[in-house]
Amino acid sequence: LAATVAVLAARAAVLLAALAIDWLVGEPDILWRRVPHPVVLFGRAITFMDKRLNRRRGVTGKSRQARGILAIVILVVLAAMLGWGLSFGGPVVACIILAVLLAARSLDEHIRAVATAMGEGIGAARTAVGMIVGRETKSMKKGDIARAAIETGAENLSDGVIAPALWFLAGGLPGLLAYKMVNTADSMIGYRNAKYRAFGCGAARIDDAMNLIPARLTALLICGAATLNGRGSAALGTMMRDGRHHA
């Protein structure tokens, strides 16, 4: 028990340092224009598996589903092994990797940009929200823009900050990289369309499972933050009402 507490304390210290670095530095564009971001590399690995295993001709739905599960298992194992190897670099390496994979400042900047743009006019607001959502924004009204920004902010707070932090605390760099691989795969192949309904369902289900606790913790944190302006009860009521509609 003492050893477990010591490990968690060490990881918590690394996490706090990484959050501070992320908040101070953010996403340095000059760096990522020269070298690929780790998530980009994960995306390339997922694309490789997609091209090699996601064949629709002459393959049944169950076979494609099995291929998709095999693909995500291989990718997760490789990500965890990479994390295990990087763990030997010590807390400094862990802190740098965690800071790179957290997205607190980037999320804050993008959401604030939408809020600022809403004061400048509907056109600017549509452009700003278009930077963080994949849906069409040309016909959005102010209410739609605010709703889209809030939804995206809540989702990315869970996926980009809370979940990576929890998985790092629980599993160190192997847990962190395994989570980021699954989350990236879900964003790329976890769609309910003809191409990915079968092949991507494994990634989508694993992503749901790995986000089960982080998503609920994120919702509670948002409710806690809402108490600062006296809206805690309303936020909690919304969470209880709408939570069943989400994974």
Segments (PLM) and residue ranges:
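Hydrophobic alpha-helical transmembrane segments
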Residues: L1-A178, V182, G190-A247
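Solvent-exposed interhelical
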Residues: S187
